Each structure stands twice: as structure tokens, then as C-alpha cells.
Design a protein with these regions (language model features):
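N-terminal secretory signal peptides and thylakoid transit peptides that target proteins
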Residues: 1-15
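Early extracytoplasmic/lumenal segment of secretory-pathway proteins
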Residues: 63-79, 83
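Hydrophobic alpha-helical targeting segments used for export or membrane insertion
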Residues: 12-20, 27
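N-terminal glycine-rich cofactor-binding segment that shapes the pocket for flavin-like pterin cofactors
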Residues: 30, 72, 76-77, 90, ...
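Short, polar/charged alpha-helical segment
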Residues: 42-67, 177, 181-184
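Immediate post-signal peptide segment of exported/extracytoplasmic ligand-binding proteins
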Residues: 22-37, 50, 57-65, 159-171
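Extracytoplasmic "Venus flytrap"
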Residues: 33-50, 71-76
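Contiguous mixed-secondary-structure segments that line small-molecule binding/active-site clefts
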Residues: 54, 80-86, 91, 96-184
Length: 184
């Protein structure tokens, strides 16, 4: 998610960067602050966030740069990330809407386990759903991407979960309000 001020700066920089080589040389460098709770050694950070930032920097000819802050390095909690983008403290965040129980109620369904079999198809459905039915939940920012991890995996230390029966006897912490309700 990105706040509208940053989107405007990025859009202007991108428009200038694509107009001509001569103009590109004169275009100002835009530096965007990217903040997330993901650890810098995590797969999501290395293979998605960092890779995306590197690609944007390269394709913009170095005119769009990033200050990257994984692992909540700028302070706050994961619950506060959305407000940090909304309030202009940072330009781009990556977070889980389910971390903020009740704030984005219409998209919480996309975090339920056993609801999907293909992360790519479900991520596309998530995007279309938000654009069509839930855009007002994110009205203070410009959503850049939405994704799910497939297929709604439940993580444990030593037991694979294939069905509800596999949960018997386990102590489980739910990542969001609907999942915690289902587990209760």
C-alpha cells in the first residue's frame, strides 16, 4: 500500500522517466520509504519485496529508489503499518489486513484456511473483489498489490495439517479475528 502523496511523486517520476532520454537525465530522483514487519532474511522479503524494489530501481534508470526498513525498523507494530502509510510516515508498506482485527472486515475471508487451492487465482480474485466491493476499506491509500499465500496453510512445529481433524489436541494461535473465532 502506498499513500496518495507518494503515488503522485512516483507517477510524476515515472511519467518523466518515460517521456524521453533527455528528460530522463533531468528527472529528479524519488526515494520511497518501504516498511514492513517481515524479517530481512525471510523468503517474502528476499524473493518478493527486495526483488521488486531492485526491479523498479533498475527499470526507472535509478530515478526511483527505496529506503528499505524490514522487521519494523522504523518502530511501531504491524498493526500500525497501515496508519504509517496513511499518515505519510512511510510511503509503502506490506502488511496483513488480518493483523488489524475488524478494520478491513470484507477482506478477512481471504485469510481463511482451506478456502483456496491456487494462490495465483485467489490473489487475482482478491484484487478484483477489493476493486469492486471493498475499495472504501482502503480509501486513504493506493493499494499496489494484494496477494494470498496458498493454500491457506496452517503452520505448526511438527505436524502437517490436511483437515480439521488434524487440529485435534493442538494449541493454535489464529492470525486474524475470523480464524481465531473458527478455532475457538
Amino acid at each position: 500500500m502506498i499513500n496518495r502523496r507518494s503515488l503522485l511523486k512516483t507517477g510524476v517520476a515515472a511519467a518523466v522517466a518515460t517521456s524521453s532520454v533527455a528528460t530522463l537525465a533531468l528527472a529528479p530522483v524519488v526515494t520511497l520509504k518501504f516498511h514492513t514487519f517481515m524479517a530481512p532474511q525471510s523468503n517474502v522479503w528476499l524473493n518478493m519485496h527486495k526483488a521488486w524494489m531492485d526491479k523498479v530501481e533498475k527499470e526507472s534508470g535509478g530515478r526511483i529508489k527505496f529506503e528499505a526498513y524490514p522487521a519494523m525498523q522504523l518502530g511501531g507494530t504491524p498493526v500500525q503499518l497501515y496508519d504509517q502509510a496513511k499518515d505519510g510516515v512511510v510511503d509503502i508498506i506490506w502488511t496483513l489486513p488480518g493483523n488489524t482485527a475488524g478494520r478491513f472486515p470484507r477482506v478477512e475471508v481471504f485469510e481463511l484456511p482451506f478456502m483456496m487451492s491456487n494462490a495465483e487465482a485467489t490473489s487475482k480474485a482478491y484484487w478484483e473483489y477489493v476493486q469492486t466491493f471493498a475499495a472504501d476499506e482502503f480509501k486513504d491509500v493506493q493499494v499496489l498489490a494484494l496477494q494470498v499465500h496458498g493454500p491457506g496453510v496452517i503452520h505448526t512445529t511438527d505436524k502437517l495439517i490436511h483437515s480439521v481433524d488434524d487440529l485435534k489436541g493442538l494449541k493454535i494461535r489464529g492470525p486474524s479475528r475470523p480464524i481465531t473465532t473458527l478455532l475457538a
